[in-house]
């Protein structure tokens, strides 16, 4: 036998009946008993949607147990009822005074002692009316143990209570306070209760989740829960390495709808939380998660947070991530989603992350973030220009953050460095390894595009810089170092054009751009006014954009040109002073460097050439060159203050001659005599 949505293998009806025709139709009365075997719902499993929609949630074991119990109860069962029915014309009524359902699975349901169900037809508006006076109980076979008590209300409709024992399944437990409800004559049933839930989550569980519940069941069976805000509390929650302690918040229906609804469209509804604030641990480290607003949908199992802020680790120097938008979804694998407008900082590291966007996931106790970001200097004014990464990947697992990415110059896309970061949330210690495979400076990429500190110091660079560095941090202490090198670079420096610059630079404070003493730069040529070649400069980079020149040496015109020790300040646009010492300059060789073909000279010079370099270029201020008299020792000067030069009239210093062509017709006698004198001048 099959009728509507219910089928049975065998149905028996016994009893007595009376029938008599009347002017309005047929009067009939039946008193009897009905029994049916193997009752089952026809068509698809009506609870299949419940199983799928709760998968991975704390109530999943309860939903599975309930669905399995209903399925098992439908395989081998028997239903019995005693009833009486009366029909007068087109109206009728029936009263069921005893009914029970039993299954081989152990499931039982039935009317309580002295209870009855009354049916009448047609009710106002058509259809079938019903009323229960007494109780209905369920138990066994995996079904919840429950008792429903109803009574007719004087004004119509029903009122009653539902008592349900705590329902458990594989680590899940649902407890309901007595459900109080009332049903109107139109078929709408309203109810109130409170739930307390314990249940498993991936790698953890929720414990003591409590929520007052108010809802209704429509005439078509649609269930609606909590159309208004209600206080949600929980004792603890653990999801992988994410854990919360005691938490309280107001849970409101999203967009004015119900918090939860279940009907022909399946499980729907959504929640909204204003001013979210959660405190707990992530990966064993302290965690605070806050947001201006949070929303979640039960239908799509998605959620989003607006202006979310995540703090991890030591509250005094936490890992900080702030996202204007964080969206995600939950599935059997865990959580995943997208983020945008994200900013962040790790502890006290003077590096800031901004404009980050990409994808994130949380599964198997591992948080992973992949996307793009901009890295800037936390110092003001900034020491380096912003860099971008389009392949940044961050992972948090077991209280350890690891991150990798390529840092690019944003305008040209040139690779500046590859970074590899490790940070321990528990201790607050970590390090960032920087690998600079080779930054090639061209007309498109210049040093000032990477750091403003290069402005006014170097320009028109052509060459490659490569090296490695490391930044380390622990508590409030940040240290860094690195070694970088270049070979055969050309550039325009503050003291003139430079070609063939080569050397290695060892930083003792990479972030502060401080080097070890006695760094060596080899220079093929430099031209502060006169070109000199094959120089060696020893120097040290100091804090606050200071450069200490320890020495500079060049072979120069048969002698030696030395740059005296000095400290130059590049922190501001102001004149910079250097002093070059000349020892043993050969006059003839020097004239050759000036390309003066018609001049010949002999002699040796010593001296000191103080120079000032500013926006006008370089110039000598107060310099001294002394023609060394033959037979005298070199004059080695450190300054020109109170300088006194002695001269022995008996000793010569050198000769100067004009060796160019002269036209006798144009000069005349006295002109010829003058140029004859210029052909061999002695000086001292």
Regions found by a protein language model. Name each.
Residues 604-606:
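Short, solvent-exposed loop/turn segments enriched in Ser/Thr/Gly
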Residues 1-468, 475-480, 485-599, 633-684:
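Interface amphipathic segments
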């Amino acid at each position: 036998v099959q009728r509507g949505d219910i089928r049975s293998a065998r149905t028996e009806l016994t009893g007595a009946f009376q029938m008599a025709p009347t002017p309005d139709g047929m009067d009939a009365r039946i008193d009897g008993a009905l029994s049916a075997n193997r009752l089952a719902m026809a068509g698809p499993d009506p609870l299949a949607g419940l199983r799928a929609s709760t998968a991975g949630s704390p109530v999943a074991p309860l939903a599975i147990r309930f669905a399995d119990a209903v399925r098992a109860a439908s395989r081998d069962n028997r239903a019995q009822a005693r009833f009486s029915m009366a029909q007068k014309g087109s109206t009728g009524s029936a009263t069921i005074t005893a009914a029970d359902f039993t299954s081989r699975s152990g499931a039982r349901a039935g009317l309580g002692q002295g209870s009855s169900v009354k049916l009448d037809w047609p009710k106002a508006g058509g259809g079938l009316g019903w009323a229960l006076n007494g109780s209905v109980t369920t138990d066994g076979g995996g079904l919840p143990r429950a008792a429903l008590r109803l009574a007719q209300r004087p004004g119509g409709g029903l009122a009653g209570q539902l008592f349900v024992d705590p329902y458990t399944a594989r680590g899940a437990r649902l407890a309901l306070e007595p459900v109080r409800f009332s049903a109107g004559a139109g078929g709408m049933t309203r109810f109130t209760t409170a739930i307390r839930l314990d249940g498993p989550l991936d790698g953890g569980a929720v414990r003591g989740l409590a929520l007052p519940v108010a809802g209704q069941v429509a005439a078509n069976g649609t269930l609606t829960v909590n159309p208004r805000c209600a206080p949600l509390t929980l004792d603890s929650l653990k999801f992988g390495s994410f854990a919360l302690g005691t938490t309280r918040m107001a849970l409101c229906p999203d967009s004015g709808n119900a918090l939860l609804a279940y009907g022909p469209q399946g499980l729907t509804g959504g929640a909204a939380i204003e001013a979210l604030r959660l405190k707990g641990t992530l990966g064993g480290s302290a965690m605070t998660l806050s947001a201006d607003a949070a929303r979640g949908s039960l239908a799509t199992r998605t959620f989003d947070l607006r202006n979310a802020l995540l703090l991890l680790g030591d509250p005094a120097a936490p890992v900080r991530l702030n996202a204007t938008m964080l969206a995600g979804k939950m599935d059997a694998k865990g959580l995943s989603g997208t983020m945008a407008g994200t900013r962040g900082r790790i502890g006290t590291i003077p590096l800031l992350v901004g404009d980050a966007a990409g994808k994130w996931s949380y599964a198997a106790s591992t948080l992973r973030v992949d996307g793009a970001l901009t890295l800037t200097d936390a110092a003001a004014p900034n020491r380096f220009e912003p860099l971008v990464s389009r392949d940044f990947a961050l992972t948090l697992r077991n209280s350890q953050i690891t991150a990798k990415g390529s840092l690019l110059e944003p305008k040209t896309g040139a690779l500046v460095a590859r970074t590899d970061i490790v940070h321990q949330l528990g201790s607050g210690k970590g390090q960032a390894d920087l690998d600079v495979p080779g930054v090639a400076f061209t007309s498109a990429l210049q040093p000032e595009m990477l750091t403003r500190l290069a402005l006014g110091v170097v320009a028109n660079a052509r060459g490659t810089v490569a090296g490695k560095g490391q930044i380390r941090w622990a508590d409030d202490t940040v240290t860094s170092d690195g070694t970088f090198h270049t070979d055969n670079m050309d550039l325009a420096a503050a003291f003139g054009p430079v070609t063939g610059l080569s050397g290695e630079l060892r930083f003792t404070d990479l972030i502060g751009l401080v080097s070890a003493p006695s760094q060596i730069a080899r220079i093929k040529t430099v031209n502060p006014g006169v070109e000199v070649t094959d120089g060696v400069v020893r120097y040290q980079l100091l804090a606050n954009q200071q450069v200490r020149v320890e020495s500079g040496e060049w072979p120069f015109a048969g002698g030696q040109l030395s740059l005296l020790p000095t400290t130059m300040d590049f922190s501001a646009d102001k004149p910079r002073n250097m002093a070059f010492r000349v020892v043993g300059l050969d006059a003839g060789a020097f004239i050759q460097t000036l390309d003066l073909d018609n001049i010949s000279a002999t002699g040796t010079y010593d001296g000191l050439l103080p120079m000032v370099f500013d926006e006008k270029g370089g110039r000598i201020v107060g310099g001294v060159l002394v023609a060394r008299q033959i037979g005298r020792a070199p004059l080695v000067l450190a300054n020109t203050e109170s300088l006194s030069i002695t001269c022995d009239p008996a000793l010569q210093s050198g000769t100067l001659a004009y060796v160019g062509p002269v036209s006798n017709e144009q000069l005349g006698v006295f002109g010829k005599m003058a140029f004859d004198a210029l052909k061999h001048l002695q000086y001292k």
